[in-house]
Amino acid sequence: MNFTLFSGTSEQPRLPQDPSAEPFELKAVAGPDIWRTPSSAGGRDDFSGPIYATPLSLDSFKRAQVTISANFQAPYSQGGLILFMPESDPTVDADGQSLRLHESLSTWIKAGIELVDDQLFASIAAGKPYSDWSLTRLGENTATFEMEKKNGSLWIYVVGSDGNRTPLRKLTWVFDMKPQRDVWVGVAACMPKGDGTANGGSFAVQFRDFGITTE
């Protein structure tokens, strides 16, 4: 599988060609997010957070998992798995090192850890076309998240420090989609609010034990 960085920052550390073989880190700066709402709920349309992902056919997807850890300080700082469906082919960014999409995507799912009201949650958001969002109290800054195709639906699980695998969400519509292009599966990091410093600071998310299974 060939992995590609989307919307990378100048502070981004080296990323491994095979992210399943070694731990790695994504760096986010203040501002970019992955979130979409109608005008009645604020009118945001944003798909600009850094992502490290690989393309594959939706029919072939079976499972993705990763262990996430970070020093969550800024409101809504987040990191986790992502699956998204581009409507057009991405192009090389001006830095020549990453890809960029021409439009804010209408179909995506992200699952990871997020800081909300000074507490850590397992956070699931899905856009189709607007974002919905669910939170489950986690209380720790390290956890493993899994996306799995099961009986035609996408299930999302979290595994905490106690080793228990807890189902968080069942999305029944994902594999009913008929995308004209490959979907992309990988990891993302965002810090939409900044950390209160003059330039908003930066936020690093560590990922390990990353893997994708196809069928």
Ranges and model annotations:
Residues M1-E215:
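Extracellular glycan-recognition regions
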